[in-house]
Amino acid sequence: MKLDNFVASSDIYDVYESDGMAVRIYKKPEYKEKCLYAALTHARVETTLGNSFIKMPVLHEVSVIDGKWAITMDFIKGKTLQQLMDENPDKKDTYLNQFIDIQCEIHAQYMPLLSKLKDKMARQIKTLGQIDEIKKYELLTRLDSMPKHIKLCHGNFEPKNVIINDEGTYVINWGSARQGNASADVARTYLLFCLNNPDLAEA
């Protein structure tokens, strides 16, 4: 497989386009667990969204390429909602409403087989080095008291992860998806807006 067309990169993987497929190559061989977990999460979400208007790339293969773990799925052509907002600022409110409708549709799905968002948050709190044990205990107690839901939470939902083309609406990058409280997922999106799109956070 030729991997000449570089598309994007994150801390742990690079993405290439090859023959109509998106190939996510994990940067280190020891990322095997991350690769397999991401593939399992993607597959479970893919099955659940089968009856939704939201589409997502079809996962085709998990493999090892040049000693590194890889996931191969459909390469989705089109423009992201972020690109559309940047190119058409006069339609920002329209695109933002579309974005909200998509997130509401995601949260309408129930995902009892996914890992729990609460468990992920608890692990992150426990490993924080910037706060003392008393503050950690307070945060964990508040987290435990919050309502327990099994709604689908994307975990990284922002306009750059929504692609629009002639075939419909696609949501990508499901590696952080969990089951949990939709309000937490919305709060995460708002935080991403504050960091990356302050004008959208104000809208």
What are these language model-derived features?
Residues 4-38, 84:
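ATP-binding glycine-rich loop module of kinase domains
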Residues 14-17, 141-184:
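Active-site acidic catalytic loop and adjacent metal/ATP-binding pocket
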Residues 26, 63, 76:
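Residues forming the ATP-binding cleft of Hanks-type serine/threonine protein kinase domains
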Residues 38, 42-46, 103-106, 189:
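AlphaC helix (C-helix) of the protein kinase catalytic domain N-lobe
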Residues 46-62:
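Conserved HxN/HPN-centered segment at the entrance to the catalytic loop
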Residues 79-118, 133-138, 142-146, 152, ...:
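Conserved kinase catalytic-core helix
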Residues 186-203:
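Active-site activation/catalytic loop segments of kinase-like enzymes and analogous catalytic loops
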